[in-house]
């Protein structure tokens, strides 16, 4: 039974996207329970895009980018925000039509509004990943990123995975016609109206203060080294453990992002740290591929 959700609330907006993509055959999975900078880090995207096994999924992913914090003073810059990620493997021929259908489900008339696909190829140096892509502009504002993964963890993607990443806050601000993310209505029900600011404003103030002023630099350097060491250990076992090793990659990546926010890494060092994360990602990708291959790629029917 299809329920009609109020897309003029952030809650209803997310529920509508989930329901739409579920109807297209996606598994609606849950967010990763770790600090990541983007939905692409979720194993459902990074790891599942490797090898021949088909997989279509969709999920909300809380994302953290410490350097983007503004102490809750900027109406559209956040250090913690939400992405809605759709991963389609193999990428269907009608992926753009499916995306436009999701906008229609959100009440956006694609015949009336100016919707443009602007070429913007994507790259993630830390994940050793890149793809051909497009930004989707709605009346002159970027709201979504399309990517066709060509390579992940240094491994060629075959078949190609199609990824759609919605910027939830930005798209919701457009739908609700508000100028500040904190004015977004999260829900408006029997218990009263709750805004995005009611839930997250204090968090933005405090986390920005931590990210820029109090994150322990020495601890973060040590944490990065320890995560790298553990990742290498897990991959060197007689029976490697690529999934736990990948968690170490994500922890190291977040430690790096906090060091970046604290201005603790020089330009030269920054590149070296990116290459260290990339080397870990590549090792995980190769190990994961080999593990699935040893199982006979069980999702291939």
UniProtKB/Swiss-Prot annotation:
Pfam families: tRNA-synt_2e (PF02091). Its main location: cytoplasm. InterPro entries: aa-tRNA-synth_II/BPL/LPL, Gly-tRNA-synth_heterodimer, Gly-tRNA_ligase_asu. Its EC number is 6.1.1.14. It catalyses: tRNA(Gly) + glycine + ATP = glycyl-tRNA(Gly) + AMP + diphosphate. Keywords: Aminoacyl-tRNA synthetase, ATP-binding, Cytoplasm, Ligase, Nucleotide-binding, Protein biosynthesis. One of its GO terms (cellular component) is cytosol. It is found in: Cytoplasm. GO terms for molecular function: ATP binding; glycine-tRNA ligase activity. GO terms for biological process: glycyl-tRNA aminoacylation. HAMAP family: Gly_tRNA_synth_alpha. Belongs to the class-II aminoacyl-tRNA synthetase family. PANTHER family: GLYCINE--TRNA LIGASE, CHLOROPLASTIC_MITOCHONDRIAL 2 (PTHR30075:SF2), GLYCYL-TRNA SYNTHETASE (PTHR30075). NCBIfam families: glyQ, PRK09348.1. Tetramer of two alpha and two beta subunits. This is Glycine--tRNA ligase alpha subunit. It comes from Shewanella denitrificans (strain OS217 / ATCC BAA-1090 / DSM 15013). The gene is glyQ.
